[in-house]
Amino acid sequence: MTQLLLFLVALLVLGHVPSGRSEFKRCWKGQGACRTYCTRQETYMHLCPDASLCCLSYALKPPPVPKHEYE
């Protein structure tokens, strides 16, 4: 009986653990993640609505817009 009770308690606790993907809010058309700090493989793009950083992988970062030179 105690094993059954322990099993039920374990199921209840594990049922409340959030999945890893829902830990961060998504940004930049779903490609980035809102975090306090960006990892070394990511760059900061803009601020998320909650004032955290929108971190985007370097592989997904759009190329810079070329500046026009006036002669």
Swiss-Prot record:
Q: Which GO terms describe its biological process?
A: defense response to bacterium; innate immune response
User: What organism does the UniProt record list as the source?
Assistant: Pan troglodytes
Q: Which UniProt keywords apply?
A: Antibiotic, Antimicrobial, Defensin, Disulfide bond, Secreted, Signal
Subcellular location, record wording: Secreted
Residues annotated as signal peptide: 1-22
Question: What is any one of the record's Gene Ontology cellular component terms?
Answer: extracellular region
Q: What is the lineage of its organism?
A: Eukaryota, Metazoa, Chordata, Craniata, Vertebrata
User: What's this protein's name?
Assistant: Beta-defensin 124
Q: Which cysteines are joined by disulfide bonds?
A: 27-54, 34-48, 38-55
The free-text function statement in the UniProt record for this protein reads: Has antibacterial activity.
Which superkingdom, per the lineage?
Answer: Eukaryota
Where the protein is mainly located, per its record? Answer: secreted
UniProt keyword annotation of Secreted present:
yes
